[in-house]
Amino acid sequence: MLLHAAGDQHAWASFVGAGSLPTYNPFDPPARPEGTVTELVDAAVAAATAAWDQVDPASGSVPTPLPPVPTLPAEVAAAACALDAAIHAWDVAVATGQPSPLSDELAAALDPAARAVVEPLRGFAYAAPLATEATDGAAAALLRYLGRDPEWAA
């Protein structure tokens, strides 16, 4: 999962104009990173940060690494990139028995990007949505929309 998530961030960085594509397919990553996990994550965060630092949020559309959604308004694209990172952070956290890093506030901020990109990717990058529950906060509702069970634990 970490190699996939890091590869996604490198892909976003490359498409918005800074950085290079990962040397592997993020959807078929190698079993282990070339360096440490910390080096892998640090490099992905640095690449994404450097790329987005060069993008003016009011600049119009930017290219994306999402074939069904080849361009998005810059603000939506940045949020879609952040959505990818945040959801994979949730995946890793819950799979390793750690608390969710996805707050209701962050989920609410990322929800518009999810609504802009998820449906064309449904079945490939996202599972079918799960039914929401009356007690769901923004984080649980977003996870269910993305096909993830917010109650899942390792």
List where the protein language model places each region.
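Alpha-helical bundle segments that constitute or directly flank the non-heme di-iron/ferroxidase center
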Residues: L2-A18
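Structured surface interface patches that mediate subunit assembly and partner/cofactor docking
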Residues: S14-P26, E39, A43, A47-A50, ...
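Short helix/strand-bridging catalytic loops that position acidic/His residues to coordinate divalent metals
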Residues: P29
